Every structure is written in C-alpha cells, then in structure tokens.
C-alpha cells in the first residue's frame, strides 16, 4: 500500500530571466552598466553574495539573486531584516518605502538586493585593471573567508562592513534615489505566489 503523498504549499517570488534582462537593459540605457558581463566576476566569485549556494554562473544569476527570496525561516528573515535596517546608514528607509508605495517586505527586499548586486557590477566595471583583476575584491577575500567563522549578528555586522559590501550598499541606495520612480515601477510588478510541492 502506497503512502499518501503530502502536498504542502510554499510561498515564493519568481524572478524571471526576462525580468532581470529588463533591469540590465534599463541600467545599460542609463549608462550605469556597460553592455555585457564583467568576466572578472567569473574568475573570482565562488558563491553568491546575496544568496549563498549557487555555483553555476550565467547571465541570469550573475547578480546572484535567487529565484526565491521569500522565506518564513526566522534566521533567514532576520538576515534580510538586518540588511534592510543597515541601509538606513546610507539613507534608505525600507519601512517608509513600503508605506509610500504599498509594497510588501519581500518586494522591497528584492528591489534593494538586486540594486546591491548591480552595485557590485558597477564597481567591478570601474575598478578592473589591465590584467582583468579587481584589486578591491582580491583584497577583500580574506575578510569574506574570516566572516565564515563568525555567527549571528556579529557575522552580519562584519559582512556589511567588508569594503566591497559597503560600496555596493552605498551604490544601491544611490541608484534607488536617482531612479526611484522607474525602479519602483519594475518592482511593484513582483508578487508573492503560492506553489504546491510534494
């Protein structure tokens, strides 16, 4: 006798390749990004900045934004909230944005997380040397390695203060402030969906 299959519902946000390409196109048109992907990223990125665990690199996940950033796990939610709270240092108040545009937490998290990763790419494009290396990212490798041995809020605080991450955070807020209306139009389209999994 076969056991009964257990179907459970899971909330998720589906960031499609078309959606990501439209964001790339927007920032290329605004001359914030150069056309194409900085190849140095493929040399030195072993895992995702925004969501660890991805290993395959292509145009879609070069920003390291996972297909599903929605989570009900308390430790993951705490990390998301810490990231958003930390951006208040640079003038980004996610609670204000949520209220102003009637967006939910994960829409705003998706938005600023993607802008953060675009901040990394802008930095890489501008700091690449004649050999295709990024000095600032190479110098930060030891800090990323050290961060893996930390835990809890100490780890989160240290991570946000790694020079590469600080720069990307600042650029994310700058991009939002500069293109707020257009960026909001992109990310208000994102909805939390329900899917059934066995």
Label each residue range with its predicted role:
Residues 16-19, 108-111, 115-118:
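Extended low-polarity, hydrophobic cluster-rich segments
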Residues 112-125, 168:
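Active-site recognition of the HExxH zinc-binding catalytic motif
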Residues 23-31, 118, 122, 176:
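Hydrophobic, Leu/Ile/Phe/Ala-enriched alpha-helical segments that form helix-helix packing faces
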Residues 121-134, 177-186:
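Substrate-binding/catalytic groove segments of enzymes
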Residues 105-109, 124-160, 164:
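Post-HEXXH active-site segment of zinc metalloproteases
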